């Protein structure tokens, strides 16, 4: 085969090993994703600090990278590498055959031109027999290489993929196991989101970087070395000449990788800011909507994606320059080699065959060097990604929950001693929490800890569970330092129930079973009865088999708390820790649960932390804490007699406890209004969500969302299941798979860029057919008139400079302008989609289909997937189509018989390309489904690691994780063999084409010499093969396009959704509110649980300036009233009026600007305290003095002032740097600074200690003056002064009136107050 065959082979090799430049882009993006979350400054801006840069380049060594492989796997790596090296060496050796067959065709053409004389100009006698012999030798060599390349592809890919999967499987298991054994202080600085990224993304990078691409890197390096050896041995002079251009080509190859890496990092880091906005906004959507923060979040997001777009355009610019330069340098090297080579052939110092062999070998070797760069970059990426993984794997926890060390032989009685304990949280070492704490609890005693927020009460529980170790002093149990007790043994003998319980996304039965191994059904039912949970569980459609949802969102707050209490009681622990265990229960439930807890406390040591003093008045010992120290100790009677801190706390509570319950569908629990439907539906939706997330994680590497290869029934079923889930998701979004025309329609604002890119791509499509004409014309010079040899040879050599200019310009323009169009489309769709999402009603977010993780995935991954449909890959498709049509036309012009043969063989080549795409497709579709369940388990365990460790269930979650990995791991091993088989086939079909084409060409020349002369055969062959050599570049587009059609269907479907309540709409009446509220026969059911009606004809009215208090049991509909007033939902029946206007006629945004809400569990944002207080307001309209005054009213100013950074202190993600009471007071300040006309208080003071509550309640009482206030509260002292108290039961009001009136009526309200007065006495 002639010289251009080696170039074509190089181009094919580029495609065959999936080294298209877009893969370099993917690799570069993956290099930085893991680090983006750690490089956000105090303003939420992305920064690249010195440490961040060092982290990015920190890599493990190659031996360390493979340290989790067995001896057998290392042997397979060696075999795979050896075959790859041999294969790489064989490719340049093929150039020798190309030189020989080229010389044979030239010789035969010379004989024909000499009118049958068999003597060549060199004097050699060259007969037909010689010609047949030379060509058939090459044909048989090609046939051998067809088989050899199939076997080589099979061995190399299978070995590497098998080893990569085995190693990755071990790493996944060990990584999760290592995470779960780390101490809690480590999690304070290593957020679950970052760990999840490492689990999914980093491990995928390691898998990719240790898989078949490394084999390809060895093959390219071998090809590079061998290529130059062959070149120097055939013509060292021409080799040196070509080396003048080769560095440029190699430089271009590395420039592509470098520019892609650099700008992909910039783009990804800039979008990290946007992704953070999305996650924070969607996960806290009720808070954002109620505070009118939507436009602020849209602006933040728009700014971030605009920055990402600019980085993407710069990426396209440098990519275009690099592509253009590389393509142009190829043709420049042709021109230089041919121009000089012609002279040497003319002088007799070089023959044509050696010239082409040298040229082919140098081109093949130099291109291999450039192609090895991206592959080695993938290895470098894996080394960098593995660094973060191995850092966790190698880290020895300070407190190792899996350690077997420590005493297990002791029979715990429950004596607890805290001796001179000093402690600060590692994440805030400058803020001391405990300052010499001393206390003693005797076995069997019930001890209560009371004090203001931040005094260190909950810290004692954390230290008892050994979440942390003390800095000074010690804590002992039965005289043994807790540090000397086996950790698992300790935690299995201690049970804790916290204020905000963590439930797992499984059934109620499975959640309770986590409390005790081997629990019987009888024990579970008994525990649920004690926790007052049995009754409500029986009312659920699936009883104990009811799925509780992500974080228990299918249950109300009180229901979640009772499940958590039951989970603790089944353990029958020696030590029971109750941290606000009944704070979320209504009075009726709390009374029963408290009795159960009182019974449970008998015979065991119990430590109670409670703001409601009625829950601790019967404690054996009450310990008052202040500023991290114990200030007084005694029982209730003794401490009341002392009239100290405890006395002050008690007297501040007129009534001690609850009337009401934790509201159904809590406002602050962002997804809590999602209701239980059925177990099957819940499972399918949750699986669908994880499928989507995992699919997006995997599809960010390579591949498409289509079926995998059909090998057997089981594999076919898995592929179909994955596709059916995707189709189901499209159906759930009322969408259909999109197409190119719809994508182009959405890109029409950028029509000019598209026109320039597509036009230059069309022009570029004629370059390769023109190249085939120029090249065969150059070859024909060697068989033509010797007198014109030199001039004609130089002429056609210089014509390649024309191609160089055309190719360079076209490559640059189409890459750059298609990049502009695609990046602009990405920006537009991200902004449109985010705006559309934020304009949806709250019921939209209650659906698991629209969980924050899914929406984040849509914006972060699906939109970029859509972009790939019209980026530079699309321009290569246009170029390829034009090139193929023009090339086939030329082939038929030169010789239709030969053209028909080659075209007949092309489907086999296309099938090979299909197998390659199919290979990647199957891999990614399976990844979407196979790892879904395991990923869900891992993420949930990591996010709730405190609960997991407190339950001593690390092994349970680890085993569940491993169990879910088994089937996908086995499928991946099978897939390694299938991929090797298909890859070997794809790698060999092109050699089969050459075998058949040269054999038929020889037959045509012999049988029909007048029509099919050697040069006509070559013109036909090169017209098609050169023109179709770009097919390899184009094939990388179609897997991406398949992803784009699925992603686009979902995205465009979402964009077509019109919200029932558009929070961003300008429509509706904008009136100044005075505060009159009327509910008239309102009926309502949550969208996710339409069969359960919450409000059943609720009616009431509140005059301007009045305060209405709503009390009643859990699930009666109190918090639903708040949600409807905020117009999170619309009623199913009845009407709601504000100042005489039906709420549906009012502009939602304007109305909410005059309403403020404070909920039980406030949501704070990861910004400063001041920014949290003024969130949703125009910063220019609020002075710092107003902020400080609001903080004073909320009794938080002094605390803020004592912080090192004051109001500029960042509160952490969801306010994690603050205690519950501190977060609540900031939320109250946030409400007060708004000066609302209507104030909604949903358990506004429930999280506050009594001392703080007294001051805050006074502030709220003052804040109520002159405005309408609707209060939901457990503590009756917060509602007794209300103008009207309404008792809600089963969705209706059963009695209402003032405190005095209701007390005189001696109804439901009276009974509750009497109960509390009895406790008070």
UniProtKB/Swiss-Prot annotation:
InterPro entries: AAA+_ATPase, ABC1_TM_dom, ABC1_TM_sf, ABC_transporter-like_ATP-bd, ABC_transporter-like_CS, P-loop_NTPase, Type_1_exporter. It is a multi-pass membrane protein. Glycans are attached at residues 115, 125, 190, 850. The keyword Heme does not apply. Residues 1-77, 371-753, 1038-1321 are cytoplasmic. ATP 2 binds at residues 1112-1119. It is an enzyme of class 7 (translocase). Its EC number is 7.6.2.2. GO terms for molecular function: ABC-type xenobiotic transporter activity; ATP binding; ATP hydrolysis activity; ATPase-coupled transmembrane transporter activity; efflux transmembrane transporter activity. Keywords: ATP-binding, Glycoprotein, Membrane, Nucleotide-binding, Repeat, Translocase, Transmembrane, Transmembrane helix, Transport. Belongs to the ABC transporter superfamily. ABCB family. Multidrug resistance exporter (TC 3.A.1.201) subfamily. This is Multidrug resistance protein pgp-1.
């Amino acid at each position: 085969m002639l010289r251009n065959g080696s170039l074509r082979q190089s181009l094919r090799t580029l495609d065959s090993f999936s080294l298209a430049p877009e893969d370099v882009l993917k690799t570069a993006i993956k290099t930085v994703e893991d680090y983006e979350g750690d490089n956000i400054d105090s303003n939420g801006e992305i920064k690249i600090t010195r440490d961040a840069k060092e982290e990015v380049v920190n890599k493990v060594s190659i031996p360390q990278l493979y340290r989790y492989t067995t001896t057998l796997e290392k042997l397979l790596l060696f075999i795979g590498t050896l075959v790859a090296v041999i294969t790489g060496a064989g490719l340049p050796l093929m150039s020798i055959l190309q030189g020989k067959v080229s010389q044979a065709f030239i010789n035969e053409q010379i004989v024909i031109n000499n009118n049958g004389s068999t003597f060549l100009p060199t004097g050699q006698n060259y007969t037909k027999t010689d010609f047949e012999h030379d060509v058939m030798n090459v044909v048989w060599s090609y046939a051998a290489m067809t088989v050899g390349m199939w076997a080589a592809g099979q061995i190399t890919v299978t070995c590497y993929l098998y080893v990569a999967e085995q190693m990755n499987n071990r790493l996944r298991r060990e990584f999760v196991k290592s995470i779960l054994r780390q101490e809690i202080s480590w999690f304070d600085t290593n957020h679950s989101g970052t760990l999840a990224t490492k689990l999914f993304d980093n491990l995928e990078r390691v898998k990719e970087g240790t898989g078949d691409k490394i084999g390809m890197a060895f093959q390219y390096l071998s090809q590079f070395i061998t290529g130059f050896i062959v070149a120097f041995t055939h013509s060292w002079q021409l080799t040196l000449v070509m080396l003048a251009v080769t560095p440029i080509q190699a430089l271009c190859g590395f420039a592509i990788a470098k520019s892609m890496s650099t700008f992909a990092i910039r783009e990804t880091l800039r979008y990290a800011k946007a992704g953070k906005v999305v996650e924070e906004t969607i996960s806290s959507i009720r808070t954002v909507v109620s505070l009118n923060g939507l436009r602020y979040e849209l602006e933040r997001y728009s700014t971030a994606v605009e920055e990402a777009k600019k980085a993407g355009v710069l990426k396209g610019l440098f990519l275009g320059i690099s592509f253009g330069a590389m393509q142009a340098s190829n043709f420049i090297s042709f021109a230089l080699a041919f121009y000089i080579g012609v002279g040497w052939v003319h002088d007799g110092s070089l023959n044509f065959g050696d010239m082409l062999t040298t040229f082919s070998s140098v081109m093949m070797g130099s291109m291999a060097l450039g192609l090895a760069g991206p592959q080695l970059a993938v290895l470098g990426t894996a080394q960098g990604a593995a660094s973060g993984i191995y850092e966790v794997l190698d880290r020895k926890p300070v407190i190792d929950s899996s350690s077997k060390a420590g005493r297990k032989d002791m029979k715990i009685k429950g004596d607890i001693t805290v001796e001179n304990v000093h402690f600060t949280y590692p994440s805030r070492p400058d803020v001391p929490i405990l300052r010499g704490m001393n206390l003693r609890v005797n076995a069997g005693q019930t001890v209560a800890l009371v004090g203001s927020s931040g005094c260190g009460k909950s810290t004692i529980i954390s230290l008892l569970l050994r979440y942390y170790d003390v800095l000074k002093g010690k804590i002992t149990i039965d005289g043994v330092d807790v540090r000397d007790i086996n950790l698992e043994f300790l935690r299995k003998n201690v049970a804790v129930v916290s204020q905000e319980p963590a439930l797992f996304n499984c059934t109620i039965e499975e959640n309770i079973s986590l409390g005790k191994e081997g629990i019987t059904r009888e024990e579970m039912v008994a525990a649920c009865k004690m926790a007052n949970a049995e009754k409500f569980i029986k009312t659920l459609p699936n009883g104990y088999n009811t799925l509780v949802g992500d974080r228990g969102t299918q249950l109300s707050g009180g229901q979640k708390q009772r499940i958590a209490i039951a989970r603790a009681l089944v353990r029958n622990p020696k030590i029971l820790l109750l941290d606000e265990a009944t704070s979320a229960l209504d009075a009726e439930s709390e009374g029963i649960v408290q009795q159960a807890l009182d019974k449970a406390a008998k015979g065991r040591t119990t430590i109670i932390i409670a703001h409601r003093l009625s829950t601790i008045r019967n404690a054996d010992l009450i310990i008052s804490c202040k500023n991290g120290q114990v200030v007084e100790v005694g029982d209730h009677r003794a401490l009341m007699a002392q009239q100290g801190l405890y006395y002050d706390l008690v007297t501040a509570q007129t009534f001690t406890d609850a009337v009401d319950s934790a509201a159904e569908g809590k406002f602050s629990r962002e997804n809590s209004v999602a209701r239980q439907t059925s177990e099957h539906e819940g499972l399918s939706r949750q699986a669908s969500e994880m499928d989507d997330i995992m699919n997006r994680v995997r599809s960010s590497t390579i591949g498409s969302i289509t079926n995998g290869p059909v090998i057997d029934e089981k594999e076919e079923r898995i592929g179909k299941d994955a596709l059916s889930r995707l189709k189901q998701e499209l159906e759930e979004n009322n969408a259909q798979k999109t197409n190119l025309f719809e994508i182009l329609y959405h890109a029409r604002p950028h029509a000019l860029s598209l026109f320039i890119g597509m036009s230059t791509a069309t022009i570029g499509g004629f370059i390769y057919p023109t190249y085939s004409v120029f090249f065969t014309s150059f070859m024909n010079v060697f068989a033509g008139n010797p007198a014109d040899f030199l001039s004609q040879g130089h002429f056609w050599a210089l014509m390649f400079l024309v191609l160089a200019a055309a190719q360079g310009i076209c490559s640059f323009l189409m890459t750059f302008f298609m990049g502009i169009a695609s990046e602009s489309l990405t920006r537009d769709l991200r902004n449109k989609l985010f705006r559309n999402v934020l304009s949806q009603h709250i019921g939209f977010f209650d659906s698991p289909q629209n969980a924050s993780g899914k929406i984040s995935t849509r914006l972060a991954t699906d939109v970029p997937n859509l972009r790939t449909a019209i980026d530079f890959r699309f321009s290569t498709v246009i170029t390829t189509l034009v090139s193929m049509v023009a090339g086939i036309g030329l082939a038929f012009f030169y010789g239709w018989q030969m053209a028909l043969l080659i075209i007949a063989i092309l489907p086999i080549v296309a099938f090979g390309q299909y197998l390659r795409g199919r290979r990647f497709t199957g891999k990614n579709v399976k990844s979407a489904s196979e790892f879904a369940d395991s990923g869900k388990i891992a993420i949930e365990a990591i996010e709730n690691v405190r609960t997991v460790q407190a339950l001593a269930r690390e092994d349970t979650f680890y085993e569940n994780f491993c169990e879910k990995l088994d089937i996908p791991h086995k499928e991946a091993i099978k897939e390694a063999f299938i991929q090797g088989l298909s890859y070997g086939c794809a790698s060999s079909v092109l050699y089969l084409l050459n075998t058949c084409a040269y054999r038929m060409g020889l037959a045509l020349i012999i049988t029909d010499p007048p029509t099919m002369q050697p040069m006509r055969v070559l013109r036909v062959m090169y017209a098609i093969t050169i023109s179709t050599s770009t097919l390899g570049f184009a094939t990388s587009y179609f897997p991406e396009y398949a992803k784009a059609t699925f992603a686009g269907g979902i995205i465009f479907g979402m964009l077509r959704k019109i919200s029932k309540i558009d929070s961003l709409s300008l429509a509706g009446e904008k009136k100044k509110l005075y505060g009159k509220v009327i509910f008239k026969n309102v009926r309502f059911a949550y969208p996710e649980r339409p069969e359960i009606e919450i409000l059943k004809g609720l009616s009431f009215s509140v005059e301007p300036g009045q305060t209405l208090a709503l009390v009643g049991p859990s699930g009666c509909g109190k918090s639903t009233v708040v949600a409807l007033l905020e117009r999170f939902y619309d009623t199913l029946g009845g009407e709601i009026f504000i100042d005489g206007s039906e709420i549906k006629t009012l502009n939602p945004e304007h109305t909410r600007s005059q309403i403020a809400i404070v909920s039980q569990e406030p949501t704070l944002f990861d910004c400063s305290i001041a920014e949290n207080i003024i969130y949703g307001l125009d910063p220019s309209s609020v002075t710092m003095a107003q902020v400080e005054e609001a903080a004073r009213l909320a009794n938080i100013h002094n605390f803020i002032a004592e912080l090192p950074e004051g109001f500029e202190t960042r509160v952490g993600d969801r306010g994690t740097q603050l205690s519950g009471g501190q977060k609540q007071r900031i939320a109250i300040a946030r409400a007060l600074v708004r000066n609302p006309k209507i104030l909604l208080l949903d358990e506004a003071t429930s999280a506050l200690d009594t001392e703080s509550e007294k001051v805050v309640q006074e502030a709220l009482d003052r804040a109520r003056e002159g405005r309408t206030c609707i209060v939901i509260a457990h503590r009756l002292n917060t509602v007794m002064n209300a103008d009207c108290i309404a008792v809600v039961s089963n969705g209706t009001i059963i009695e209402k009136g003032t405190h005095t009136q209701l007390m005189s009526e001696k109804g439901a309200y009276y009974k509750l107050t009497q109960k509390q007065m009895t406790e008070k006495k």
